[in-house]
Swiss-Prot record:
Residues 285-356 form the KRAB domain. Gene3D superfamilies: 6.10.140.140, Classic Zinc Finger (3.30.160.60). Belongs to the krueppel C2H2-type zinc-finger protein family. Residues 1-10, 46-68 have a biased composition (Polar residues). Residues 347-356, 411-426 have a biased composition (Acidic residues). It is found in: Nucleus. This is Zinc finger protein 777. There is a cross-link at K330, K452 (Glycyl lysine isopeptide (Lys-Gly) (interchain with G-Cter in SUMO2)). GO terms for cellular component: nucleus. It comes from Homo sapiens (Human). Pfam families: KRAB, zf-C2H2. Heterooligomer with ZNF746. One of its GO terms (molecular function) is RNA polymerase II cis-regulatory region sequence-specific DNA binding. The keyword Glycosyltransferase does not apply.
Amino acid sequence: MENQRSSPLSFPSVPQEETLRQAPAGLPRETLFQSRVLPPKEIPSLSPTIPRQGSLPQTSSAPKQETSGRMPHVLQKGPSLLCSAASEQETSLQGPLASQEGTQYPPPAAAEQEVSLLSHSPHHQEAPVHSPEAPEKDPLTLSPTVPETDMDPLLQSPVSQKDTPFQISSAVQKEQPLPTAEITRLAVWAAVQAVERKLEAQAMRLLTLEGRTGTNEKKIADCEKTAVEFANHLESKWVVLGTLLQEYGLLQRRLENMENLLKNRNFWILRLPPGSNGEVPKVPVTFDDVAVHFSEQEWGNLSEWQKELYKNVMRGNYESLVSMDYAISKPDLMSQMERGERPTMQEQEDSEEGETPTDPSAAHDGIVIKIEVQTNDEGSESLETPEPLMGQVEEHGFQDSELGDPCGEQPDLDMQEPENTLEESTEGSSEFSELKQMLVQQRNCTEGIVIKTEEQDEEEEEEEEDELPQHLQSLGQLSGRYEASMYQTPLPGEMSPEGEESPPPLQLGNPAVKRLAPSVHGERHLSENRGASSQQQRNRRGERPFTCMECGKSFRLKINLIIHQRNHIKEGPYECAECEISFRHKQQLTLHQRIHRVRGGCVSPERGPTFNPKHALKPRPKSPSSGSGGGGPKPYKCPECDSSFSHKSSLTKHQITHTGERPYTCPECKKSFRLHISLVIHQRVHAGKHEVSFICSLCGKSFSRPSHLLRHQRTHTGERPFKCPECEKSFSEKSKLTNHCRVHSRERPHACPECGKSFIRKHHLLEHRRIHTGERPYHCAECGKRFTQKHHLLEHQRAHTGERPYPCTHCAKCFRYKQSLKYHLRTHTGE
């Protein structure tokens, strides 16, 4: 009986997969593979006893109640490992097992029958499992008489069967902490590895943040540098803007002055040459040059309206000088008139009174104007309010009947040379007809002012022929009730210098003003009283300080030298086919030919000669452009453009324009020119001869030729006289129109001799040929890199300056190159 109680229980083996599926959660996988733990459902003591098919019937219910809560010992092959819950339950059940020593078991025959049934059961195909003690009615309880050879060898022990259950239980208890420590160690090791991985991830993120921080710091430094550069750039822009505002103010003031001049009809001042640095024109006259003084007796003999007229004339002259920024102090004469006092005379007036210069050289160049004030003998003052003054201008050839006299009296006409009339040189001129209309006929039967003109004698004319600016000189302006301005009138042969597309600048001369004061007993001539300028003194001494560098001629006035030098740069005169007289401008020729059409020649039988050939240019050989003006046979024709010429040399020069030949080369800079005169003008740049320069009065730029100045002035006026007949585009230069027309005609006249590629413009060909020659004339001053084209250098320099001139209209980004902006715009448009 004791042996039966101490015999261990034997349980059938359970598959490993089922053991892993029903193992406790805290037990590691490796331990489960080494131990074979039976699930609770296979342990009879942990589950209620259920009859199975083939099991023995239960004989008693009493043992069932005692063994229902009992946990048998479980042994396996290999290391014995049990879960903690099973071991605790087994330990708690050792007491009841010890108290059941007297329990009766079924007879051996029944036990053997039960074992045989269990061995044939489908649930027990493996080796049988023995249980040490089992209740009598438990179907799994084995008989104590089972041979030891049929038992598991691991369960055989020399220890007594009585002590075996307790020793196995203590061994299980000793082996139980080992998997728990191992599990804890593995869990800690896994947790440490997880923490290390997190630390590594955090370290990587920290390094990434440090890199991004460094990048941001660099960007901030670049932004600060850009901000400093932008501030410096902005400061320079502010300086430039201040300069522009200052220039704008100066330009605004000049425009106001020009409006005043146009309002006062002072056109002569617009033709004055400006200063070398762009300052205001140098007015060659002073207020005293155009002022008229009266003695006390003469002033007393004047009527009130005459005094008012005198004041208006003086005031108009003063305003004309001030309107052009002419820095003069206010004359005493104007101050006296504003205070209502009598204008006092200078000290020289008394000594010079009554003197009339007889030497023509002592007088000023041009015409002499006399102002004659007439009164009748009675000196009647019956009219309280005198009518306007009757002013009559005797321009040689104007008859008295043209002006008329309501009182039937013809005023005295003091004519020195009636045979030389002004109409000779003013036929066909519109300015004198305007002057004639401006002379308002102011009638008074008792007194009047007659403006008379005198010309210098023929000998003086011949002497001063080259000095005259080829225009009549103007006196100034008469304002108030009576206005009459003597403007420069172009002569038919000298309306404009050659090479220009517009008439030449009019220059103010210094006409001698003769004053005839009123006298009760008759007409009395008074001398002109004014201060002699340095220019007048040179004229009296006969000095000619201005010399032409080309031909050696000298002149008294610089403007005469400038006009004369235009003869040297003339490229194409216009000749009259009837009298072989040449002119500088086509308009002059048209005016001259009008004489032949109207009067049949240069001489009028009624009024004498109407045209003085001395005022025209002397006949000279025709130039290539003479084919456009004048008549005559032209046997030499150009096979390229069908132009005809009268001389073979003219045709040869013209053909150079088609061949592109430039036979004249500068020895200093190796620049070549098509015409010799172009080379001469270019060499003045090297020689430093800047006297012959044409300066723009608006911006101060100087040019070597008047045509270049005229072309430049179109940039200020915005004029575009050359229009394309196909697309109606307009251009300021004819060459630009020619190049534009090639776009429509698809003409490409400039071909590369090496690769045959053709271009519309010549400078495009020059840029292209640098590809073959390897020339790179444009180099960067910062890094020394060289480029073939200038705009490539400008684009490259933006990398050094940081300039980004192309902003995006959709966002705030700016770009250095235009192509980059185009690529960026596609992100907005979605192309």
